[in-house]
């Protein structure tokens, strides 16, 4: 359905009659959700909530993306089956999405019967349409692990600049691209063995077929984002250029995924069954809710279908996915909305700086998830522009907009209304010009949200909040309250303020649903919808006692968040990097389009292989005696240790073991420290080493930290060999 066709359908349809299926990209099930992921899920959730508030039938669908070589290797490293790993990660992802108010109607898994059946059905239909081809290809093969290696699981010496430890397809030092066969001294990231060349039969989706090209040239005209349209036209090229390449949709055993029908030992490549997972998750919901699944996904369906994705996976969602659907007997997406990447303080997220922030660490630090929802929304628009989380600006904007402007309105008026007027508004005040102005602005704000221009919606909302605060400042209810003769004016001022606050809460509801829920309870009203702009507060319904809605962001919370994430992602960082070399929304797979997001994490992969005795000898491990220990003010995780390591003076070390030990428990104990670690300047002081502690790979399932204690007889300063 083109954009023009969609507009005519929407114009002809009465409000509330639209049927809309919405998806976000599927997070890969080998790592934690971080704030970079959350940009997309918050963006999608705001849009979904906006549509629901219009009364439309909207289903927001998600799932974990669970197949592929990285999952298989990660599970092996952790001593788990792939199923055990993906079940654990699913629970963690679901927890994080719930924490941030991401309102999936169904959050499922691509490792499901529904997905297997649908993937097989689509494959068979494509094959019957002559769009599946088989070809012999030569690949790198690990003779130790007995598996074919994707490009990024091979490293070696760049053939151009001779930089060491470069990937099988490109050099991060000189920027050259090449074939894996061009690498000098190649080795397998998985085992360290030298790869050999081996041929195998692979299955290809014939995207180069003229039918696919013709369809895609027509379909691209309906995309809402000019950047997406331009990129697709670049990929398609001019008519007759034949720029589209066939797509390898199979992988060889061993592989965690679905076996291809009629092809023993061959499995669907993860990028084939992953988008089918959208439909599988929706089908699972339909079966539970009694919804007619086929009516939503058949060709010509009047229901709308939208995909929110990161711009790094536009290729899959605007070429392969629509073509797969078109030629397998399904409807095609109404539109695909791509967003940019997230930077923090103007730079890529960094573990060393603590800006690679996980969703769980944000919650554990005590930060309000609706602060982040608001901040992201204030930056987001309908383009693919990258957005930046500036932590100073985050604190200033939340404190100014949400506390200083918005929440302040209710806190200034509620007490007077309850104390002086039994909590009942003045009905005549509901027609005040200021109230009328806010009421008339709601349609415009809602339209900005639906157009994905969230920054415009919030800018307009905060401009109105400024006007309300100016009105309160001018009316001075605190002065009016001093003289009983001003009772009518005081009543009007408080009533206008609270009705304005209700309308501002309506405008903010898609962004801050939990605050809106608290406001609804405060006013004793039903859940707010856009149509409720015309339904003012009434004297017939007294307000309830005002409960504080939001606190200010404290700089100490930001510092604690950075400290918690500095050098973290322990299990999911090290293991996932070794297993996949990738993080990012639905992009951590053995696929080149994921490479941009994968490089930073993948660079750690080589460090997890075997090391030589010379490498180990570089680490100076010493026996240390804890002569003093104290908690670190302002930190939930750190203890400050004073250590005797047999030198003339003691060492000062900060250690993240506060959750496991009281300071007095450690004084006098012997432990082991890394004595030659470079001193590190921290907010709380200089840390001059590292104390060793043990923990389970899955600290959620098996919590606990245990410092190492040598046998009696060991003395401070002794070297551990």
Curated annotation (Swiss-Prot):
S-S bonds: none
Keyword set, alphabetical order: Aminoacyl-tRNA synthetase, ATP-binding, Cytoplasm, Ligase, Metal-binding, Nucleotide-binding, Protein biosynthesis, RNA-binding, tRNA-binding, Zinc
Highest taxon in the source lineage: Bacteria
Binding site for Zn(2+): 158, 161, 171, 174
InterPro entries xref list: aa-tRNA-synth_I_CS (IPR001412), Anticodon_Met (IPR041872), M/V/L/I-tRNA-synth_anticd-bd (IPR013155), Met-tRNA-synth_bsu_C (IPR004495), Met-tRNA_ligase_1 (IPR023458), Met-tRNA_synth (IPR014758), Methionyl/Leucyl_tRNA_Synth (IPR015413), MetRS_core (IPR033911)
Gene Ontology annotations for the cellular component aspect, listed alphabetically: cytosol
Residues reported to bind ATP: 351
Keyword Ion transport: no
Key word Aminoacyl-tRNA synthetase present: yes
Motif ('KMSKS' region): 348-352
Primary localization: cytoplasm
EC number: 6.1.1.10
A biological-process GO annotation: methionyl-tRNA aminoacylation
UniProt short sequence motif 'HIGH' region, positions renumbered to this chain: 27-37
Similarity remark: Belongs to the class-I aminoacyl-tRNA synthetase family. MetG type 1 subfamily.
HAMAP family: Met_tRNA_synth_type1 (MF_00098)
Function: Is required not only for elongation of protein synthesis but also for the initiation of all mRNA translation through initiator tRNA(fMet) aminoacylation.
Subunit organization: Homodimer.
Annotated protein name in UniProt: Methionine--tRNA ligase
Organism: Burkholderia vietnamiensis (strain G4 / LMG 22486) (Burkholderia cepacia (strain R1808))
